[in-house]
Amino acid sequence: MRKLSLFILTCLLFISISCSESNQTISLITYNIRLDIESDVINKWDNRKEGLISLIKEENPDVLGIQEALPNQIEYISNQLEDYNMIGEGRDGGDNGEYSAIYYKSGKIRLEKTETFWLSESPEIPSIGWDAALNRITTVGVFSEVSSNKKFIVYNSHFDHIGKIARENSVNVILNHIRENNHIKNRIIVMGDFNASPNDSPIRLLSSEFDDPYINFPIKNPFGTFNGFELDSKSMERIDYIFTSNLKVVDYRHIYKRLPNNLWPSDHIPIFISVNL
């Protein structure tokens, strides 16, 4: 009887471990943090940065993709998020220009490979694509979850705000990168500020290639992600997204949180997602 009990306990432990590994969950946030610019006056970075960090720490994502971060903002965020490592470079090359950086929890997530490419006809070098106003980049991180060793790939991007053709072609640059690197069968997250509404062609193309969790986790009005620092915004544009492939999404939400003084931490709303690997 004692041997039988030990056998049953061993089986139950094995099943428990197997289930835990098969349902390993990670969380991610995409967040355009708004660049540091004095013309924002009351909404300038120095007035927002502490509250923005508090929001991130409260949500506690395993992976954080940010857009529009200048080098001084990257330095501040990196110093505040001590449990995270950062990958990415400025859109003008090296430490220059805005980052579309990815932060990841070093104790839970292992970095396997990273690269940055430009959304242009010459993705390997700093460059402006098509009718874009500015250099635009995508940061790629190939990661594995430490306890399960399960691999996943994150694309964090910021599309141009002016160039319609550039936004359309930016999707194809990302899709080509996925195909050329044989990522198509892997667990993929594509996220960022795409400066496009759901009915625009770039988002329709992304929705045809990936899953849009928003569909299965409806957001009550205001359903958008761009508040423009407007305090009474009732109907925000949805221009920030998280798309997934080969992943089960268990939670998706927009984080409508304000600072103690009732101002927004950024002119964009962060998006939170939780997935089973």
Question: In which residue ranges do the predicted regions lie?
Answer:
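Short, solvent-exposed loop/turn elements at domain surfaces
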Residues: 35-42, 66, 112, 164, ...
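Short, Asp-centered acidic motifs that coordinate Mg2+ and/or phosphate
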Residues: 26, 62-63, 152, 187-189, ...
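Structured beta-strand-rich core segments of catalytic domains in phosphoester-bond hydrolases
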Residues: 63-151, 155, 254-255
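Active-site metal-binding loops of divalent metal-dependent hydrolases
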Residues: 32-33, 157-159, 193-194, 269
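N-terminal, active-site-proximal structural segment of metallo-dependent hydrolase catalytic domains
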Residues: 2-5, 16-80, 91-97, 172, ...
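Metal-dependent phosphoester-hydrolase catalytic domains
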Residues: 108, 165, 169, 176-188, ...
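Active-site neighborhood of phospho(di)ester-bond hydrolases with catalytic His/Asp-centered motifs
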Residues: 65-67, 88-89, 189-193, 212-215
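Acidic/histidine-rich helix-loop elements
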Residues: 30-50, 119-133, 160, 227, ...
